[in-house]
Amino acid sequence: MKKIAVLTSGGDVPGMNAAIRAVVRKAAFHGINVVGIKHGYEGLVKGYLEELDLGSVGGIIQRGGTHLNSARCPEFKEDAVQQQGIENLRAAGIEGLVVIGGDGSYRGAMDLVKKGFPAVGVPGTIDNDVPGTEYTIGFDTALNTVVESIDKIRDTATSHENSFIVEVMGRDAGDIALWAGLAAGAETVLIPEEDYDLDDIVARLDRGAARGKKHSIIIVAEGVMSGNELAKLIKEKTGKETRVSVLGHIQRGGSPTARDRVLASQFGAHAVELLMEGKYGRAVGIRNHQVIDYDMPEAFEKNHEADVSLYTLMKELSI
């Protein structure tokens, strides 16, 4: 194998640049050239290619976002569009592709594999919702951003004796909400994987107030409902106002944590090894502190499951 390509797809996450860097440097170590595909699958179809070398990836490991830009490309589901992408790759002499992204990105990569083009996947999503791996690139940074934000919100909540609802990302997965809730000492956490009980939420707030607590923090993943919707339900139930803070896209940005940089470096390097070994249609992941790989369809054919033990602990500690 003499030339491979790398692209980032879907939502950007901190650590993608570290993964791109690792792909380029690992490939260079083995004498393999790397081409970067700009703007994800859209760039693959439109031929937005650029040569990457050691200089191209110098000084990017600490940067958030993605050096290659990212975009969503719904039309890539079409056979003719996929075939155009493969033709562009082959015309450029590219023999394998590393795709960094979430389950949707993996589906696109697997479509290429089914059409005979070698591709492997690297998990990059702040939601930490790719089945088969315990952690994804970007989750740790996003989690730290959320916890830091909640700490600051709690400062003002304490000063003004207010209750706050903090809405975080997580359309189908509640890992950010759950982990942040435990780390920030939230009174209540609502995640998509578990049913919520409004009476229980109110009871928890009342128990805190009964022992003299003047403020509280409720975290809700966007996939459950919006923070404003929850505030309305609580007011209808109790007559009390709760402030709402929607963290939004701040969760995607920022310099990646050391953990995300290391994880991304391990994942990117292992992806190159898979291509060199002729192991296509594989996804990189980590389990029990070991970098592993597994069949890519497992990453999008199974549903993400929340850590039940963490959820139970969260409820026990927020009595």
From Swiss-Prot:
Documented EC number(s): 2.7.1.11
GO cellular component, one term: 6-phosphofructokinase complex
Pfam families tied to this protein: PFK
Catalytic activity: beta-D-fructose 6-phosphate + ATP = beta-D-fructose 1,6-bisphosphate + ADP + H(+)
Ligand binding (substrate): 125-127, 169-171, 222, 243, 249-252
Record's protein name: ATP-dependent 6-phosphofructokinase
Cofactor: Mg(2+)
Residues bound to ADP: 21-25, 154, 185-187, 211, 213-215
UniProt keyword list: Allosteric enzyme, ATP-binding, Cytoplasm, Glycolysis, Kinase, Magnesium, Metal-binding, Nucleotide-binding, Transferase
Family annotation (NCBIfam families): PFKA_ATP, PRK03202.1
PANTHER family: ATP-DEPENDENT 6-PHOSPHOFRUCTOKINASE, PHOSPHOFRUCTOKINASE
Coiled coil: none
Gene Ontology BP terms: canonical glycolysis; fructose 1,6-bisphosphate metabolic process; fructose 6-phosphate metabolic process
